[in-house]
Amino acid sequence: MATYETFAAVYDAVMDDSLYDLWTDFSLRHLPKTKDKKKLLELACGTGIQSVRFSQAGFDVTGLDLSADMLKIAEKRASSAKQKIDFIEGNMLDLSRAGKYDFVTCYSDSICYMKDEVEVGDVFKEVYNALNEDGVFIFDVHSTYQTDEVFPGYSYHENAEDFAMLWDTYEDEAPHSIVHELTFFVQEEDGSFSRHDEVHEERTYEVLTYDILLEQAGFKSFKLFADFEDKEPTENSRRWFFVCEK
């Protein structure tokens, strides 16, 4: 059987590396790191690519993810890069044991995987409690334009020597929600290919909803940007960035 490491390699292979450069650059512009203020928690850190970049930029990084298998790969990646990073297996819906941080990030639209706005609000409350005073929380989500106009009917196919991937996206029932159907064909040790199917459900909300949920969590202010730039969103922006201050 193909291992989870295989799937992680597939994910990493099809992920656009330039996005990590953009996330890093955006973060460095908006996280006021100092000698005494550099503790950073990365939520949904996955295989640790972004965690390593934060560490290389001088942050004291902790990465949190639901998947123990993903974290094993993240630990290997950090070790290979000679970066000291703590990785925690955990859920962003419960950060009570995660410690305190100056900064928290949650990228790659991971907030959109929460099942409803109640869970989104719960994540915001958990992050608020995990932040030191004047701490900063940055997250990105799909815009409603992305979920309503861009994603429905989206289809992406990738073929490589040892794997193939089919990715199709459809509109879901709830407002601003989508379903990604992914099929992997992964080469086994004997040369044959095995098929694996995944379904990913995502949902975003109007900016006003995020505004209310952040305020209810206790954040005193936030700034809204779009598409990795320090500019306000337009009606055609695809990714919203929230920079929130405790």
Predicted segment positions?
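Conserved class I S-adenosyl-L-methionine
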Residues: M1-K35, K37-G46
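Class I SAM-dependent methyltransferase SAM/SAH-binding core
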Residues: G48-D94
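A short acidic, Gly/Pro-enriched loop at the edge of an enzyme's catalytic core
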Residues: L93-F103
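A short SAM/SAH-binding and catalytic strip from SAM-dependent methyltransferases
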Residues: D102-V118
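A short glycine-rich, Lys/Arg-flanked "PGG" loop and its adjoining helix->strand segment in the class I
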Residues: G121-E133
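SAM-dependent methyltransferase
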Residues: I138-T209
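C-terminal lobe and adjacent flexible extensions of AdoMet/dcAdoMet transferase-like proteins
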Residues: E201-K246
